[in-house]
Regions:
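Phosphate-handling catalytic cores of nucleic-acid transaction enzymes
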Residues: 142-143
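Feature for exported/extracytoplasmic and membrane-associated proteins, marking the mature portion
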Residues: 1-103, 107-115, 133, 147-158
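Acidic/histidine-rich, metal-coordinating catalytic segments
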Residues: 121-129
Length: 158
């Protein structure tokens, strides 16, 4: 081992990459008929599930304690939604983002929590707030309103 902090960080990074390659997330099979969407978030949640499952293998014990996923595209000052009166369907960036989030969370919940009984908690939040009211371009500007969602078997809704 080395005592140089940057050298140790580099060694830790290489060790993590080696472990990730050994896990082989690409070959992961979701449980319970869960289907992860073919979106960036869906693929990331599927990989996260693979890492959590590998953690339950004795050779990777205590490997995964927390996973952070950063998903962009939520800073929507305009075009969050539009409504088609003929079809009765909402479209727009917020609809697209919320659908992708819901589908990925549904697959993750079904795969790990319902089907495998894993004790996993998912926390969804933003690093900045929004104004509650819409601006003049069907968007919202930065403000003090925010949301936090928590999902897991030990979470009591409310």
């Amino acid at each position: 081992g080395t005592t140089e902090p940057l050298a140790q960080s580099a060694a830790d990074t290489l060790a993590t990459i080696t472990r990730l390659n050994q896990i082989g997330a690409a070959g992961y099979t979701p449980a319970g008929g869960a289907v992860y969407p073919e979106t960036t978030l869906g693929r990331t949640m599927r990989t996260s599930a693979a890492l959590i499952e590998a953690n339950n293998n004795a050779s990777y014990n205590q490997f995964v304690e927390a996973i952070a996923i950063d998903v962009g595209g939520w800073d929507t000052h305009a075009g969050q939604y539009s409504f088609n009166n003929t079809t009765g369907v909402f479209t727009g960036s917020m609809v697209t983002n919320m659908t992708a989030l819901a589908e990925a969370l549904n697959a993750f919940y079904r795969d790990l929590i319902v089907s495998r009984g894993r004790s996993v908690t998912v926390v969804i939040t933003s690093e900045f707030g929004r104004r509650v009211g819409e601006n003049g371009t069907t968007g919202t500007d930065h403000g003090f309103g925010n949301v936090m969602m928590v999902l897991g078997s030990a979470v009591l809704g409310g």
